[in-house]
Amino acid sequence: MRLHAFTLLSLLGLVPSFAAASLSGSVGPLTSASAKAAKKTCNVLDYGAKADKKTDLGPPLAAAFAACKSGGLVYIPAGDYAMSTWVKLANGKAWALQIDGVIYRTGTDGGNMIMIEHTSDFELYSSTSSGAMQGLGYEFHASNNWSGPRLLRLWDVSDFSVHDLILVDSPSFHFSIDTCSNGEVYNMAIRGGNHGGLDGVDVWSTNIWIHDLEVTNKDECVTVKSPAKNILVENIYCNLSGGCAMGSLGADTDISDITYKNIYTWNSNQMMMIKSNGGSGTVSNVVFENFIGHGNAYSLDIDSFWSSMSAVSGDGVTLNNITIKNWKGTEANGAQRGPIKIICPDKVPCYNILIEDFAMWTETGSKQWYSCQSAYGSGFCLKSGSHHTSYAVTTTTVSSAPSGYSAAKMASDLSTDFGSTKSIPIPTIPTSFYPGATPYSALMSKQSTKAAKARAVDMSVETPAAASRSEQVVQGAPQETGQSAPESAGPVPSGNPGPVPTGGSRPSRHRHGHHHFGSAI
Protein backbone atom coordinates (compact mmCIF):
# COMPACT_ATOMS: atom_id res chain seq x y z
CA MET A 1 0.00 0.00 0.00
CA ARG A 2 1.29 3.41 -0.93
CA LEU A 3 0.93 6.19 1.64
CA HIS A 4 0.72 9.88 1.02
CA ALA A 5 3.50 11.75 2.79
CA PHE A 6 1.20 14.32 4.37
CA THR A 7 -1.28 11.67 5.52
CA LEU A 8 1.51 9.70 7.20
CA LEU A 9 2.79 12.78 8.99
CA SER A 10 -0.71 13.62 10.17
CA LEU A 11 -1.08 10.14 11.64
CA LEU A 12 2.20 10.63 13.47
CA GLY A 13 0.93 13.91 14.90
CA LEU A 14 3.65 15.98 13.24
CA VAL A 15 1.25 18.23 11.35
CA PRO A 16 -2.46 18.99 11.80
CA SER A 17 -4.65 16.70 9.73
CA PHE A 18 -6.80 19.53 8.35
CA ALA A 19 -3.79 20.88 6.45
CA ALA A 20 -3.90 17.81 4.21
CA ALA A 21 -6.93 19.42 2.61
CA SER A 22 -4.88 22.50 1.75
CA LEU A 23 -1.73 21.42 -0.05
CA SER A 24 -2.07 18.80 -2.75
CA GLY A 25 1.56 18.00 -3.52
CA SER A 26 5.17 19.10 -3.41
CA VAL A 27 6.12 22.76 -3.26
CA GLY A 28 9.39 24.54 -3.99
CA PRO A 29 12.13 24.36 -6.64
CA LEU A 30 13.14 21.01 -8.11
CA THR A 31 16.89 21.70 -7.97
CA SER A 32 18.91 23.58 -5.38
CA ALA A 33 20.27 27.07 -5.92
CA SER A 34 23.76 25.69 -5.31
CA ALA A 35 23.37 23.30 -8.24
CA LYS A 36 22.12 26.15 -10.39
CA ALA A 37 25.06 28.36 -9.35
CA ALA A 38 27.52 25.56 -10.03
CA LYS A 39 26.21 25.20 -13.56
CA LYS A 40 26.53 28.91 -14.31
CA THR A 41 26.59 32.19 -12.38
CA CYS A 42 25.63 35.43 -14.12
CA ASN A 43 26.68 38.43 -12.03
CA VAL A 44 24.89 41.61 -13.11
CA LEU A 45 28.14 43.56 -12.55
CA ASP A 46 29.58 41.64 -15.50
CA TYR A 47 26.73 42.90 -17.69
CA GLY A 48 27.03 46.61 -16.95
CA ALA A 49 25.34 47.03 -13.59
CA LYS A 50 26.83 49.44 -11.07
CA ALA A 51 26.01 49.73 -7.39
CA ASP A 52 26.01 53.52 -7.58
CA LYS A 53 22.27 54.17 -7.11
CA LYS A 54 22.27 55.88 -10.53
CA THR A 55 22.95 53.37 -13.31
CA ASP A 56 19.82 51.57 -14.51
CA LEU A 57 19.83 47.95 -13.36
CA GLY A 58 17.12 46.93 -15.83
CA PRO A 59 19.22 46.17 -18.96
CA PRO A 60 22.07 44.41 -17.07
CA LEU A 61 19.55 42.28 -15.19
CA ALA A 62 17.82 41.33 -18.43
CA ALA A 63 21.17 40.49 -20.03
CA ALA A 64 22.29 38.38 -17.07
CA PHE A 65 19.00 36.51 -17.17
CA ALA A 66 19.35 35.85 -20.91
CA ALA A 67 22.71 34.21 -20.21
CA CYS A 68 21.41 32.06 -17.33
CA LYS A 69 17.76 31.44 -18.23
CA SER A 70 18.37 27.83 -19.29
CA GLY A 71 19.99 26.94 -15.99
CA GLY A 72 22.04 29.05 -13.63
CA LEU A 73 22.02 31.72 -10.96
CA VAL A 74 21.59 35.44 -11.64
CA TYR A 75 23.38 37.37 -8.92
CA ILE A 76 22.86 40.95 -7.72
CA PRO A 77 25.62 41.59 -5.15
CA ALA A 78 25.28 43.79 -2.08
CA GLY A 79 25.04 47.49 -2.83
CA ASP A 80 22.52 50.13 -3.89
CA TYR A 81 21.10 49.89 -7.42
CA ALA A 82 18.81 52.20 -9.35
CA MET A 83 16.14 50.71 -11.59
CA SER A 84 14.40 52.90 -14.15
CA THR A 85 13.28 50.31 -16.71
CA TRP A 86 11.35 47.21 -15.79
CA VAL A 87 12.21 43.63 -16.71
CA LYS A 88 10.10 40.72 -17.88
CA LEU A 89 12.09 37.54 -17.24
CA ALA A 90 10.24 34.92 -19.27
CA ASN A 91 10.60 31.29 -20.27
CA GLY A 92 13.33 30.41 -17.81
CA LYS A 93 13.98 26.93 -16.50
CA ALA A 94 16.03 25.74 -13.55
CA TRP A 95 17.32 29.19 -12.63
CA ALA A 96 17.57 31.35 -9.52
CA LEU A 97 17.72 35.07 -8.79
CA GLN A 98 19.81 36.05 -5.76
CA ILE A 99 19.23 39.66 -4.67
CA ASP A 100 21.71 40.68 -1.99
CA GLY A 101 21.58 44.38 -2.87
CA VAL A 102 18.85 46.98 -2.56
CA ILE A 103 16.98 47.92 -5.74
CA TYR A 104 15.62 51.48 -5.72
CA ARG A 105 12.84 52.40 -8.12
CA THR A 106 13.81 55.45 -10.18
CA GLY A 107 11.52 54.94 -13.20
CA THR A 108 7.89 56.04 -13.39
CA ASP A 109 6.27 53.58 -15.80
CA GLY A 110 3.37 51.42 -14.71
CA GLY A 111 3.44 47.64 -14.83
CA ASN A 112 5.76 45.45 -12.76
CA MET A 113 9.35 46.28 -11.85
CA ILE A 114 10.29 42.60 -11.90
CA MET A 115 8.01 40.11 -13.62
CA ILE A 116 8.81 36.41 -13.72
CA GLU A 117 6.64 34.48 -16.18
CA HIS A 118 6.34 31.10 -17.93
CA THR A 119 9.03 29.66 -15.69
CA SER A 120 9.69 26.38 -13.90
CA ASP A 121 12.10 25.29 -11.15
CA PHE A 122 12.79 28.81 -9.90
CA GLU A 123 14.10 30.41 -6.70
CA LEU A 124 14.19 34.09 -5.71
CA TYR A 125 15.97 34.94 -2.47
CA SER A 126 18.56 36.98 -0.60
CA SER A 127 21.47 35.07 0.90
CA THR A 128 21.88 37.79 3.54
CA SER A 129 18.16 38.16 4.30
CA SER A 130 18.64 41.87 3.62
CA GLY A 131 18.13 42.08 -0.13
CA ALA A 132 15.27 44.45 -0.87
CA MET A 133 13.19 46.30 -3.42
CA GLN A 134 12.54 49.89 -2.34
CA GLY A 135 9.64 51.25 -4.37
CA LEU A 136 9.73 54.81 -2.98
CA GLY A 137 5.99 54.88 -3.46
CA TYR A 138 5.63 58.04 -1.41
CA GLU A 139 6.90 59.98 -4.43
CA PHE A 140 3.66 58.99 -6.18
CA HIS A 141 1.41 59.04 -3.16
CA ALA A 142 2.35 62.56 -2.06
CA SER A 143 0.56 63.82 -5.18
CA ASN A 144 -2.38 61.43 -4.68
CA ASN A 145 -1.21 59.07 -7.43
CA TRP A 146 -1.96 55.43 -6.56
CA SER A 147 -1.46 53.86 -9.99
CA GLY A 148 2.31 53.51 -10.12
CA PRO A 149 4.22 50.28 -10.75
CA ARG A 150 3.96 47.07 -8.76
CA LEU A 151 7.17 45.65 -7.32
CA LEU A 152 7.08 41.90 -7.99
CA ARG A 153 4.78 39.61 -9.95
CA LEU A 154 5.01 35.91 -10.73
CA TRP A 155 2.83 34.62 -13.54
CA ASP A 156 2.63 31.01 -14.70
CA VAL A 157 5.54 29.89 -12.54
CA SER A 158 5.73 26.32 -11.27
CA ASP A 159 7.91 24.61 -8.66
CA PHE A 160 9.32 27.75 -7.09
CA SER A 161 10.17 29.55 -3.88
CA VAL A 162 10.55 33.20 -2.87
CA HIS A 163 12.15 33.90 0.49
CA ASP A 164 14.40 36.07 2.65
CA LEU A 165 13.40 39.15 0.65
CA ILE A 166 12.15 42.59 1.75
CA LEU A 167 9.62 44.62 -0.25
CA VAL A 168 9.12 48.26 0.72
CA ASP A 169 6.81 51.13 -0.22
CA SER A 170 5.41 49.98 -3.51
CA PRO A 171 3.63 52.66 -5.54
CA SER A 172 0.94 49.98 -6.01
CA PHE A 173 0.79 46.27 -5.11
CA HIS A 174 3.85 44.65 -3.55
CA PHE A 175 3.73 40.96 -4.53
CA SER A 176 1.30 39.10 -6.80
CA ILE A 177 1.29 35.33 -7.37
CA ASP A 178 -0.76 34.87 -10.52
CA THR A 179 -1.75 31.46 -11.92
CA CYS A 180 1.25 29.69 -10.41
CA SER A 181 1.61 26.21 -8.93
CA ASN A 182 3.68 24.28 -6.39
CA GLY A 183 5.21 27.32 -4.75
CA GLU A 184 6.59 28.27 -1.33
CA VAL A 185 6.85 31.85 -0.05
CA TYR A 186 8.43 32.48 3.34
CA ASN A 187 10.67 34.63 5.53
CA MET A 188 9.70 37.98 4.09
CA ALA A 189 8.94 41.48 5.35
CA ILE A 190 6.62 43.74 3.38
CA ARG A 191 6.17 47.35 4.45
CA GLY A 192 3.91 49.74 2.56
CA GLY A 193 2.14 53.03 2.96
CA ASN A 194 -0.93 53.57 5.11
CA HIS A 195 -3.48 53.62 2.30
CA GLY A 196 -5.73 51.30 0.32
CA GLY A 197 -4.51 49.78 -2.92
CA LEU A 198 -1.05 48.90 -1.58
CA ASP A 199 -1.61 45.16 -1.22
CA GLY A 200 0.95 42.98 0.53
CA VAL A 201 0.54 39.51 -1.01
CA ASP A 202 -2.23 38.57 -3.46
CA VAL A 203 -2.40 34.96 -4.58
CA TRP A 204 -4.62 33.22 -7.12
CA SER A 205 -2.90 29.94 -7.86
CA THR A 206 -2.79 26.24 -7.02
CA ASN A 207 -0.84 24.38 -4.33
CA ILE A 208 0.95 27.29 -2.66
CA TRP A 209 2.43 27.42 0.86
CA ILE A 210 2.85 30.94 2.28
CA HIS A 211 4.34 31.15 5.75
CA ASP A 212 6.38 33.31 8.11
CA LEU A 213 5.65 36.75 6.68
CA GLU A 214 5.22 40.20 8.22
CA VAL A 215 3.09 42.76 6.38
CA THR A 216 2.54 46.43 7.22
CA ASN A 217 0.26 48.50 4.96
CA LYS A 218 -3.40 49.46 4.96
CA ASP A 219 -4.85 47.00 2.50
CA GLU A 220 -4.46 43.28 1.87
CA CYS A 221 -2.07 41.46 4.20
CA VAL A 222 -2.15 37.98 2.58
CA THR A 223 -5.23 37.63 0.40
CA VAL A 224 -6.54 34.76 -1.72
CA LYS A 225 -8.30 35.71 -4.93
CA SER A 226 -10.13 33.64 -7.52
CA PRO A 227 -9.39 31.13 -8.92
CA ALA A 228 -7.42 29.40 -6.17
CA LYS A 229 -7.09 25.86 -4.86
CA ASN A 230 -4.96 24.17 -2.22
CA ILE A 231 -3.46 27.19 -0.48
CA LEU A 232 -1.91 27.02 3.00
CA VAL A 233 -1.20 30.34 4.73
CA GLU A 234 0.34 30.21 8.20
CA ASN A 235 2.48 32.11 10.69
CA ILE A 236 1.46 35.52 9.35
CA TYR A 237 2.04 38.81 11.19
CA CYS A 238 -0.33 41.52 9.95
CA ASN A 239 1.32 44.38 11.82
CA LEU A 240 -0.82 47.47 11.35
CA SER A 241 -2.22 46.29 8.03
CA GLY A 242 -5.46 45.88 6.17
CA GLY A 243 -5.67 42.28 7.33
CA CYS A 244 -6.10 38.95 5.55
CA ALA A 245 -8.99 38.35 3.19
CA MET A 246 -10.57 36.50 0.32
CA GLY A 247 -11.69 38.65 -2.56
CA SER A 248 -12.99 40.81 -3.86
CA LEU A 249 -15.05 37.99 -5.38
CA GLY A 250 -17.06 38.39 -8.58
CA ALA A 251 -18.46 36.21 -11.35
CA ASP A 252 -17.53 32.52 -11.57
CA THR A 253 -15.63 32.47 -8.28
CA ASP A 254 -13.74 29.21 -7.82
CA ILE A 255 -11.90 28.92 -4.50
CA SER A 256 -11.49 25.70 -2.52
CA ASP A 257 -9.28 23.91 -0.02
CA ILE A 258 -7.79 26.94 1.69
CA THR A 259 -6.31 27.04 5.20
CA TYR A 260 -5.22 30.08 7.19
CA LYS A 261 -3.51 29.06 10.43
CA ASN A 262 -1.57 31.00 13.09
CA ILE A 263 -2.57 34.49 11.96
CA TYR A 264 -1.70 37.41 14.25
CA THR A 265 -3.38 40.71 13.40
CA TRP A 266 -2.60 44.00 15.12
CA ASN A 267 -4.42 47.32 14.69
CA SER A 268 -5.72 46.43 11.23
CA ASN A 269 -8.97 46.68 9.30
CA GLN A 270 -9.93 43.07 10.03
CA MET A 271 -8.58 39.71 11.12
CA MET A 272 -10.23 37.94 8.19
CA MET A 273 -12.73 39.07 5.58
CA ILE A 274 -14.54 37.38 2.70
CA LYS A 275 -15.81 40.19 0.49
CA SER A 276 -18.20 40.18 -2.43
CA ASN A 277 -21.21 42.02 -3.84
CA GLY A 278 -23.24 39.85 -6.16
CA GLY A 279 -21.32 37.54 -8.45
CA SER A 280 -21.47 33.76 -8.72
CA GLY A 281 -19.48 30.61 -8.08
CA THR A 282 -18.31 29.01 -4.85
CA VAL A 283 -15.91 29.21 -1.94
CA SER A 284 -15.65 25.84 -0.19
CA ASN A 285 -13.55 23.77 2.20
CA VAL A 286 -11.93 26.62 4.11
CA VAL A 287 -10.33 26.64 7.57
CA PHE A 288 -9.49 29.76 9.61
CA GLU A 289 -7.72 28.41 12.71
CA ASN A 290 -5.60 29.91 15.49
CA PHE A 291 -6.24 33.62 14.99
CA ILE A 292 -5.11 36.24 17.51
CA GLY A 293 -6.19 39.84 17.13
CA HIS A 294 -5.84 43.12 19.01
CA GLY A 295 -7.10 46.59 18.19
CA ASN A 296 -8.70 45.66 14.87
CA ALA A 297 -11.81 47.31 13.48
CA TYR A 298 -13.42 44.02 12.42
CA SER A 299 -12.58 40.49 13.49
CA LEU A 300 -14.48 37.93 11.39
CA ASP A 301 -16.19 39.81 8.57
CA ILE A 302 -18.02 37.87 5.85
CA ASP A 303 -19.81 40.49 3.79
CA SER A 304 -21.71 39.50 0.64
CA PHE A 305 -22.95 43.05 0.14
CA TRP A 306 -19.62 44.80 0.50
CA SER A 307 -20.28 48.39 -0.44
CA SER A 308 -16.67 49.23 -1.30
CA MET A 309 -16.98 47.26 -4.55
CA SER A 310 -19.48 47.80 -7.33
CA ALA A 311 -22.23 45.21 -7.53
CA VAL A 312 -21.56 42.32 -9.91
CA SER A 313 -24.28 40.54 -11.86
CA GLY A 314 -25.36 37.29 -10.23
CA ASP A 315 -27.19 35.85 -7.23
CA GLY A 316 -24.05 35.89 -5.08
CA VAL A 317 -21.09 33.69 -4.25
CA THR A 318 -21.99 30.47 -2.41
CA LEU A 319 -19.94 29.80 0.72
CA ASN A 320 -19.95 26.31 2.21
CA ASN A 321 -17.89 24.18 4.58
CA ILE A 322 -16.14 27.05 6.35
CA THR A 323 -14.54 26.37 9.76
CA ILE A 324 -13.60 29.18 12.16
CA LYS A 325 -11.73 27.74 15.12
CA ASN A 326 -9.70 29.01 18.08
CA TRP A 327 -9.93 32.78 17.77
CA LYS A 328 -8.76 34.89 20.72
CA GLY A 329 -8.11 38.52 21.54
CA THR A 330 -9.83 41.87 21.43
CA GLU A 331 -11.49 44.16 18.90
CA ALA A 332 -11.34 47.96 18.98
CA ASN A 333 -15.03 48.65 19.63
CA GLY A 334 -17.46 45.74 19.76
CA ALA A 335 -20.53 47.95 19.96
CA GLN A 336 -19.65 49.60 16.65
CA ARG A 337 -18.23 46.56 14.87
CA GLY A 338 -18.90 43.24 16.52
CA PRO A 339 -16.40 40.37 16.32
CA ILE A 340 -18.68 38.11 14.23
CA LYS A 341 -20.37 39.39 11.09
CA ILE A 342 -21.61 36.79 8.60
CA ILE A 343 -23.82 38.39 5.96
CA CYS A 344 -24.61 35.97 3.13
CA PRO A 345 -26.58 36.32 -0.14
CA ASP A 346 -30.32 35.78 0.25
CA LYS A 347 -30.56 33.77 -2.98
CA VAL A 348 -27.62 31.49 -2.14
CA PRO A 349 -27.32 31.30 1.66
CA CYS A 350 -24.08 30.14 3.25
CA TYR A 351 -24.16 26.68 4.81
CA ASN A 352 -21.99 24.28 6.82
CA ILE A 353 -20.36 27.17 8.66
CA LEU A 354 -18.78 26.09 11.95
CA ILE A 355 -17.63 28.51 14.65
CA GLU A 356 -16.02 26.97 17.71
CA ASP A 357 -13.64 28.05 20.46
CA PHE A 358 -14.18 31.71 19.56
CA ALA A 359 -13.55 34.24 22.35
CA MET A 360 -13.12 37.92 21.52
CA TRP A 361 -13.94 40.97 23.63
CA THR A 362 -14.18 44.70 23.12
CA GLU A 363 -11.42 47.12 24.10
CA THR A 364 -13.91 50.01 24.30
CA GLY A 365 -17.13 49.94 26.29
CA SER A 366 -18.80 46.86 27.73
CA LYS A 367 -20.91 45.47 24.89
CA GLN A 368 -20.41 43.70 21.59
CA TRP A 369 -22.60 42.02 19.00
CA TYR A 370 -22.73 39.02 16.69
CA SER A 371 -24.62 39.38 13.41
CA CYS A 372 -25.76 36.82 10.81
CA GLN A 373 -27.92 36.87 7.68
CA SER A 374 -28.89 33.90 5.51
CA ALA A 375 -26.12 31.86 7.14
CA TYR A 376 -26.42 28.27 8.38
CA GLY A 377 -24.23 26.11 10.54
CA SER A 378 -23.22 25.89 14.17
CA GLY A 379 -22.19 28.57 16.65
CA PHE A 380 -23.27 32.02 17.80
CA CYS A 381 -25.87 33.62 15.48
CA LEU A 382 -25.78 30.93 12.79
CA LYS A 383 -29.06 29.09 12.17
CA SER A 384 -29.20 25.31 12.12
CA GLY A 385 -31.09 23.11 9.71
CA SER A 386 -30.71 21.59 6.27
CA HIS A 387 -33.35 23.73 4.55
CA HIS A 388 -31.38 26.82 3.64
CA THR A 389 -33.76 29.69 3.06
CA SER A 390 -32.97 33.36 3.33
CA TYR A 391 -33.53 35.26 6.54
CA ALA A 392 -33.05 38.85 7.64
CA VAL A 393 -30.14 40.03 9.73
CA THR A 394 -30.23 38.75 13.29
CA THR A 395 -28.07 40.44 15.90
CA THR A 396 -27.21 39.23 19.36
CA THR A 397 -25.73 41.73 21.83
CA VAL A 398 -23.77 40.57 24.87
CA SER A 399 -22.48 42.58 27.82
CA SER A 400 -20.11 40.14 29.50
CA ALA A 401 -16.70 39.04 28.29
CA PRO A 402 -16.32 35.41 27.21
CA SER A 403 -13.94 33.25 29.16
CA GLY A 404 -10.52 32.66 27.69
CA TYR A 405 -10.41 35.68 25.39
CA SER A 406 -7.04 36.96 26.65
CA ALA A 407 -4.26 36.42 24.13
CA ALA A 408 -0.58 37.17 23.76
CA LYS A 409 0.80 40.17 21.93
CA MET A 410 3.88 40.51 19.76
CA ALA A 411 6.77 42.62 21.01
CA SER A 412 7.13 44.34 17.62
CA ASP A 413 3.56 45.64 17.34
CA LEU A 414 3.82 49.06 15.70
CA SER A 415 2.46 52.05 17.58
CA THR A 416 2.17 54.29 14.51
CA ASP A 417 1.88 53.77 10.77
CA PHE A 418 4.34 55.04 8.17
CA GLY A 419 1.93 57.37 6.42
CA SER A 420 2.06 57.67 2.66
CA THR A 421 3.95 60.88 1.90
CA LYS A 422 7.37 60.24 3.42
CA SER A 423 10.12 57.73 2.77
CA ILE A 424 9.52 54.39 4.50
CA PRO A 425 12.59 52.74 6.05
CA ILE A 426 13.66 49.27 5.01
CA PRO A 427 12.93 46.86 7.89
CA THR A 428 14.69 43.69 8.89
CA ILE A 429 12.91 40.37 8.51
CA PRO A 430 11.68 39.26 11.94
CA THR A 431 12.40 35.87 13.45
CA SER A 432 8.92 35.50 14.96
CA PHE A 433 5.57 35.89 13.19
CA TYR A 434 3.02 34.40 15.62
CA PRO A 435 3.15 34.12 19.42
CA GLY A 436 4.86 30.89 20.42
CA ALA A 437 5.34 29.60 16.87
CA THR A 438 8.82 28.88 15.55
CA PRO A 439 9.37 29.72 11.87
CA TYR A 440 9.73 26.67 9.68
CA SER A 441 13.05 27.88 8.26
CA ALA A 442 15.82 29.97 9.80
CA LEU A 443 16.69 33.16 7.98
CA MET A 444 19.47 32.76 5.44
CA SER A 445 21.52 35.28 7.43
CA LYS A 446 21.23 33.08 10.53
CA GLN A 447 22.20 30.00 8.56
CA SER A 448 25.21 31.90 7.19
CA THR A 449 26.38 32.94 10.65
CA LYS A 450 26.08 29.39 11.93
CA ALA A 451 28.02 28.06 8.94
CA ALA A 452 30.73 30.70 9.37
CA LYS A 453 31.20 29.79 13.03
CA ALA A 454 31.45 26.12 12.10
CA ARG A 455 34.11 26.94 9.51
CA ALA A 456 36.06 28.96 12.07
CA VAL A 457 36.14 25.96 14.40
CA ASP A 458 37.16 23.66 11.56
CA MET A 459 39.96 25.95 10.40
CA SER A 460 41.31 26.34 13.93
CA VAL A 461 42.39 22.69 13.85
CA GLU A 462 43.53 22.61 10.22
CA THR A 463 47.08 22.78 8.99
CA PRO A 464 48.09 26.15 7.53
CA ALA A 465 47.90 24.73 4.03
CA ALA A 466 44.41 23.37 4.59
CA ALA A 467 43.29 26.66 6.14
CA SER A 468 44.58 28.50 3.10
CA ARG A 469 42.61 26.25 0.78
CA SER A 470 39.47 26.79 2.90
CA GLU A 471 39.84 30.55 2.69
CA GLN A 472 40.18 30.35 -1.08
CA VAL A 473 36.95 28.38 -1.33
CA VAL A 474 35.02 30.80 0.92
CA GLN A 475 36.05 33.81 -1.13
CA GLY A 476 35.85 32.17 -4.54
CA ALA A 477 33.01 31.71 -6.97
CA PRO A 478 31.22 28.36 -7.33
CA GLN A 479 33.64 25.91 -8.94
CA GLU A 480 33.22 24.53 -12.45
CA THR A 481 33.43 21.02 -11.00
CA GLY A 482 29.86 21.34 -9.71
CA GLN A 483 30.81 22.38 -6.19
CA SER A 484 28.03 24.17 -4.31
CA ALA A 485 28.33 27.89 -3.73
CA PRO A 486 30.05 28.51 -0.39
CA GLU A 487 28.23 29.66 2.68
CA SER A 488 29.35 32.87 4.34
CA ALA A 489 28.45 35.19 7.17
CA GLY A 490 27.47 38.00 4.83
CA PRO A 491 28.21 39.40 1.39
CA VAL A 492 31.13 37.54 -0.15
CA PRO A 493 34.13 39.63 -1.32
CA SER A 494 34.69 40.43 -5.00
CA GLY A 495 31.01 40.29 -5.87
CA ASN A 496 30.68 36.52 -5.66
CA PRO A 497 27.44 34.88 -4.58
CA GLY A 498 26.89 34.19 -0.90
CA PRO A 499 25.25 31.12 0.61
CA VAL A 500 22.55 29.37 -1.34
CA PRO A 501 19.43 27.94 0.28
CA THR A 502 18.29 24.38 0.55
CA GLY A 503 14.68 25.16 1.43
CA GLY A 504 12.64 25.20 4.60
CA SER A 505 12.46 22.63 7.35
CA ARG A 506 8.87 21.47 7.42
CA PRO A 507 8.57 17.70 7.96
CA SER A 508 8.77 15.51 4.82
CA ARG A 509 11.24 17.74 3.01
CA HIS A 510 11.74 16.54 -0.54
CA ARG A 511 14.93 16.82 -2.58
CA HIS A 512 16.64 20.20 -2.98
CA GLY A 513 14.25 22.01 -0.65
CA HIS A 514 11.22 20.89 -2.63
CA HIS A 515 8.66 20.28 0.11
CA HIS A 516 6.57 17.17 -0.35
CA PHE A 517 2.88 17.19 0.57
CA GLY A 518 0.35 14.63 -0.45
CA SER A 519 2.27 12.85 -3.22
CA ALA A 520 2.75 9.13 -2.91
CA ILE A 521 5.92 7.80 -1.34
Swiss-Prot record:
This is Probable rhamnogalacturonase B. The keyword Transmembrane helix does not apply. Coiled coil: none annotated. It comes from Aspergillus fumigatus (strain CBS 144.89 / FGSC A1163 / CEA10). Its EC number is 3.2.1.171. Residues 1-21 form the signal peptide. Glycans are attached at N145, N239, N321. It comes from the Eukaryota. One of its GO terms (molecular function) is rhamnogalacturonan alpha-L-rhamnopyranosyl-(1->4)-alpha-D-galactopyranosyluronide lyase activity. It is an enzyme of class 3 (hydrolase). The keyword Hydrolase applies. It catalyses: Endohydrolysis of alpha-D-GalA-(1->2)-alpha-L-Rha glycosidic bond in the rhamnogalacturonan I backbone with initial inversion of anomeric configuration releasing oligosaccharides with beta-D-GalA at the reducing end. Residues 462-521 are annotated as: Disordered. It is found in: Secreted. Belongs to the glycosyl hydrolase 28 family. Pectinolytic enzymes consist of four classes of enzymes: pectine lyase, polygalacturonase, pectin methylesterase and rhamnogalacturonase. Hydrolyzes alpha-D-galacturonopyranosyl-(1,2)-alpha-L-rhamnopyranosyl linkages in the backbone of the hairy regions of pectins. The active site is at D219 (proton donor), H294. Pfam families: Glyco_hydro_28 (PF00295), Pect-lyase_RHGA_epim (PF12708). Keywords: Carbohydrate metabolism, Cell wall biogenesis/degradation, Disulfide bond, Glycoprotein, Glycosidase, Hydrolase, Polysaccharide degradation, Secreted, Signal.
